[in-house]
């Protein structure tokens, strides 16, 4: 069992939200999730540098790396050639969504034993509201529960599985705590130890602070997390964020929950690294239409429509080109998405493409979609899509699909990062 760290300090930052217990939120984060799952499934990979890609091709990008690979400088987003130059012995494995979804579901069930309020933030991260524990868990300490979850992960999923656990009064501080001692750490941030913990961190160690945000903070003499704690709310509102977000930062730093709202879907996208630079026009179009069908299925699974479609390509010289289409008439049938995508891609030099992508945007609910003049035809298309979706949910994705996207089995299912909205249809 990993060390449990609980730093104490006489310096305290008062929590404005006194009604919430200091240790009411638990953040659980699997370590290097995809790579660790692969090492669990294949014991011969344990202790070795492993990189996960959607496909093993020359131009493939790394979507996950084992801790052994990270220690050698391998990073998410690297291309295969760049990674192999750093680590010639790097082992590549393709994503297998069925494995990842299985672990996600097992982890969620374990977490649900400790609260009626469990939110999965992504396939490998979840939040437990410990104020809603069942009676048989009510008297247990959060640290005890966290230790048990870590042990159950090993026992019920696999002995190689590890997770980080963070405990605090809100999601932001709990996530910060979960990132303190990777891999396999467990930490608690309270009003008594927050200043001491923050004194050991850099600004970009805090969730939500990127290079751009750090630059804005530095411009008003905020250089450390301690400076950020000490900053006045007015400074964060007027000078840093220039919006209500500054007030949210002031509050989340003090343990007040401001991140418990569910955001609407603003866009849905997919991309694909082409396996060859010698694909025919028909082969390229089939891959485009495969992506379009997949996006349509995801859009309809949430009863949503789109009004915009954005297509792009990346060339072998790393030039990125795009086209977009925006209409007043919302759409979500495969036919509409395919038609718009076809038209836009004809305006781009597909012969030089290394990667292609499609994004649907201006997303709106089903109830907001307007009627068409040719509504009977639209109704038939809707019914056809509904039948396709039902068959594919029952028998597996792409059991039935358009003949125009035939022979594209090499386009694998992609696990969405940062959301679990679409996992049920994969």
What are these regions (language model features)?
Residues 14-18, 27, 213-353, 425:
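DNA-contacting surface of Y-family translesion DNA polymerases
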Residues 159-161, 305, 352, 367:
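Short loop/turn segments at connectors of secondary-structure elements within structured domains
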Residues 167-171, 252-253, 305-316, 354-364, ...:
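A glycine-rich phosphate-binding loop feature that marks nucleotide/adenosyl-phosphate handling sites
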Residues 335-394:
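C-terminal hydrophobic structural anchor segments
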């Amino acid at each position: 069992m990993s060390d449990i760290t609980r730093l104490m300090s006489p310096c305290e930052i008062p929590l404005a939200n006194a009604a919430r217990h200091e240790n009411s939120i638990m953040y659980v984060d699997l370590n290097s999730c995809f790579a660790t799952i692969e090492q669990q499934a294949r014991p011969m990979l344990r202790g070795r540098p492993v990189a996960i890609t959607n496909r093993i091709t020359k131009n493939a990008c790394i979507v996950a790396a084992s801790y052994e690979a990270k220690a050698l400088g391998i990073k998410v987003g690297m291309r295969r050639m760049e990674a192999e130059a750093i680590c010639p012995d790097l082992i590549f494995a393709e994503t297998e969504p069925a494995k990842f979804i299985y672990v996600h579901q097992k982890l969620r069930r374990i977490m649900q034993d400790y609260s009626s309020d469990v939110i999965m933030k992504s396939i490998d991260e979840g939040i437990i509201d410990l104020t809603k524990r069942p009676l048989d868990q009510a008297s247990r300490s959060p640290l005890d529960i966290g230790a048990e979850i870590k042990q159950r992960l090993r026992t019920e999923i696999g002995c190689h599985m590890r997770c980080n656990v963070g405990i605090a009064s809100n999601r932001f501080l709990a996530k910060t705590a979960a990132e303190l001692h990777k891999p396999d750490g467990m930490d608690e941030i309270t009003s008594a130890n927050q200043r001491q913990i923050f004194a050991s961190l850099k600004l970009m160690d805090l969730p939500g602070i990127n290079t751009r945000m750090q630059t804005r903070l530095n411009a008003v003499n905020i250089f450390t997390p301690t400076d950020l704690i000490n900053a006045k709310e007015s400074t964060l509102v007027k000078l840093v964020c220039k919006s209500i977000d500054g007030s949210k930062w002031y509050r989340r730093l003090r343990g007040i929950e401001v991140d418990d709202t569910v955001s609407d879907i603003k866009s849905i996208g997919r991309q694909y690294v082409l396996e060859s630079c010698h694909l025919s026009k028909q082969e390229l179009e089939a891959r485009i239409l495969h992506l379009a069908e997949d996006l349509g299925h995801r859009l309809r699974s949430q009863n949503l429509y789109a009004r915009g479609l954005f297509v792009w390509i990346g060339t072998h010289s790393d030039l990125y080109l795009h086209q977009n289409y925006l209409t007043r008439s919302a759409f979500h049938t495969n036919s509409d998405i395919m038609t718009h995508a076809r038209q836009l891609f004809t305006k781009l030099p597909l012969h030089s493409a290394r990667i292609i992508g499609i994004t649907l945007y201006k997303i709106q609910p089903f109830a907001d979609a307007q009627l068409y003049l040719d509504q009977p035809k639209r109704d038939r298309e809707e019914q056809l899509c509904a039948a396709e979706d039902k068959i594919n949910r029952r028998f597996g994705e792409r059991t039935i699909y358009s003949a125009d996207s035939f022979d594209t089995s090499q386009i694998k299912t992609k696990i969405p990062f940062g959301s679990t909205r679409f996992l049920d249809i994969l």
